[in-house]
C-alpha cells in the first residue's frame, strides 16, 4: 500500500501512469539522495541512468548496483556526447534547472537523448516562490543560496515546442497525496520535536511549477 502511495507522488506519478510494470529507460537528471534505489524499488523493470555533479551525493554502492550507468558531470558545460541520442523513454528533471544559469540550454541539449514518443518532466520553484515566507528547508526561492535562476511555464513551453516537444500538462504542482499528508506531517514533526520544513507546504502554497511534454519530432522539426 505504501509503495502504491509513493507512486502517486510527483516524482513518480507519470512513470506509473505511462509505464507501470512495463520496461522503460529513465534518464534521471539529478540522481542523488538514493534516487536510483527508490526508483528501482517502485519500478523494477526500469533501466535507470543517472546524472549528477557528484556521484557521492547521498548515494552508496546499493544505488550504483541498480544503475545501468552513472554520468558524473557539470550540466552547465553542455557536454553530453557521452549520453546516447534517442535512447530514453523518460527524462526526469526535478528541482535541477533553478540551480543552473543556463538551464534552458541544458534542456535543449538533453531533448535529443529522448526517443520519439518519450517524455520529459521538469519541476522547479515558480515565480510565486519568491513571494512566500522564508522557512527552514526552503519555502521561499531565496532560502536556498544555490538557486540562481527563476523559470516559468511561459518560458519552458515554447522552448520545448522549438525542440519538437508537445506539452501535455503544465502549471502549479498540487499533489493530492502531499496535500492530504500535510496536517499529519506537521503533527508528526511537532510531536517528535522536529523543525517544520518548508517543503511540507509546497503543494499547499504553490511553491513549485512543472511541465510534462512528449517528443514528437527531432530538434529540426522532422520526426526522428
Residue locations for each model-derived region?
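Conserved N-terminal segment of class I S-adenosyl-L-methionine
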Residues: 1-86, 90-92, 104-107, 170-172, ...
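S-adenosyl-L-methionine-dependent methyltransferase catalytic module, highlighting the catalytic core
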Residues: 13, 76, 90, 101-112, ...
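Residues lining the SAM
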Residues: 94-97
Amino acid at each position: 500500500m505504501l509503495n502504491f502511495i509513493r507512486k502517486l507522488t510527483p516524482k513518480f506519478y507519470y512513470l506509473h501512469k505511462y509505464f507501470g510494470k512495463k520496461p522503460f529507460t529513465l534518464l534521471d537528471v539529478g540522481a542523488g539522495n538514493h534516487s536510483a534505489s527508490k526508483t528501482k524499488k517502485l519500478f523494477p523493470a526500469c533501466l535507470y541512468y543517472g546524472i549528477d555533479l557528484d556521484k557521492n551525493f547521498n548515494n552508496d554502492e546499493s544505488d550504483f548496483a541498480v544503475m545501468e550507468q552513472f554520468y558524473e558531470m557539470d550540466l552547465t558545460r553542455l557536454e553530453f556526447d557521452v549520453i546516447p541520442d534517442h535512447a530514453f523513454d523518460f527524462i526526469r528533471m526535478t528541482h535541477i534547472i533553478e540551480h543552473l544559469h543556463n538551464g534552458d540550454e541544458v534542456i535543449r541539449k538533453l531533448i535529443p537523448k529522448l526517443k520519439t514518443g518519450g517524455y520529459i518532466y521538469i519541476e522547479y520553484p515558480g515565480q510565486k516562490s519568491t513571494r512566500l515566507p522564508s522557512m527552514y528547508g526552503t519555502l521561499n526561492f531565496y532560502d536556498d543560496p544555490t538557486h540562481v535562476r527563476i523559470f516559468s511555464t511561459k518560458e519552458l513551453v515554447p522552448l520545448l515546442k522549438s525542440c519538437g516537444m508537445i506539452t501535455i500538462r503544465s502549471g502549479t504542482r498540487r499533489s493530492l497525496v502531499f496535500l492530504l499528508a500535510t496536517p499529519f506531517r506537521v503533527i508528526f514533526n511537532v510531536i517528535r520535536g522536529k523543525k517544520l520544513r518548508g517543503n511540507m507546504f509546497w503543494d499547499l502554497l504553490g511553491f513549485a511549477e512543472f511541465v510534462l511534454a512528449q517528443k514528437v519530432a527531432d530538434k529540426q522539426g522532422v520526426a526522428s
